[in-house]
């Protein structure tokens, strides 16, 4: 005769508690797994955020350096523009100055040429411009009753004694020596100016013109 055993209410409760515990442990394990995964993902996110922050920091540094470089370039360009404008103004001023000097030089040349022409007619003396400024070469014409007398001369510009003797000879022939000397001086001045460089050297400021020599002062031949 088989014995039929039925579960008591106590056993059912124990079994239910056991199954519940197993279920809770499974849920706990599943929860722990999710928490671990969440923490792992959170760590990855933090590391990614940290890397992003470092990249942002590097970009900000690069941007700051570029901005500083750009500011320097802008300052340089502004300074260059100021210098360029100053140079333009200076060049305009120099252009006006050279134009004025050229005009004055032309005016002076015309005045000298007019004076040379007048003195040449007054003293009846004709100067060989090609020989100047190295030599004083030309001819003085003396009017005569029957015919004119020619007095040629050809001397070194530095031959002060020879020029002095020539002046004395011309004076003895009633030639206005003062005007004759002025003619020679102006012709010499014209020759030196026409042969001078466009931009004379700085030392030229200290040079004296040959016309400053007193042609009447006695000096020995060199």
Curated annotation (Swiss-Prot):
An annotated GO BP: cell division
The chain's coiled-coil residues are 51-86
| Keyword Cell division found | yes
Taxonomically, the superkingdom here is Eukaryota
Keyword list, A-Z:
Cell cycle, Cell division, Centromere, Chromosome, Coiled coil, Kinetochore, Meiosis, Mitosis, Nucleus
Where it sits in the cell: the answer is: Nucleus; Chromosome, Centromere, Kinetochore
Its GO CC terms are:
kinetochore; Ndc80 complex; nucleus
Q: Describe the disruption phenotype.
A: Die as late third-instar larvae. Mitotic neuroblasts in larval brains exhibit high levels of aneuploidy: chromosome alignment is compromised during spindle formation, many chromosomes display persistent mono-orientation which leads to aneuploidy during anaphase. Chromosome behavior is also disrupted during both meiotic divisions in spermatocytes: the entire chromosome complement often moves to only one spindle pole.
Question: Does Membrane count among this protein's keywords?
Answer: no
Q: What is its main location?
A: nucleus
Protein family: Belongs to the SPC25 family.
How is the quaternary structure described? Component of the Ndc80 complex, which is composed of Ndc80, Nuf2 and Spc25.
Functionally, this protein is described as follows: Acts as a component of the essential kinetochore-associated Ndc80 complex, which is required for chromosome segregation and spindle checkpoint activity during meiosis and mitosis. Required for kinetochore integrity and the organization of stable microtubule binding sites in the outer plate of the kinetochore. Participates in SAC signaling that responds specifically to disruptions in spindle microtubule dynamics. The NDC80 complex synergistically enhances the affinity of the SKA1 complex for microtubules and may allow the NDC80 complex to track depolymerizing microtubules.
What is the protein name for this chain?
Kinetochore protein Spc25
Instruction: Name the encoding gene, please.
Output: Spc25
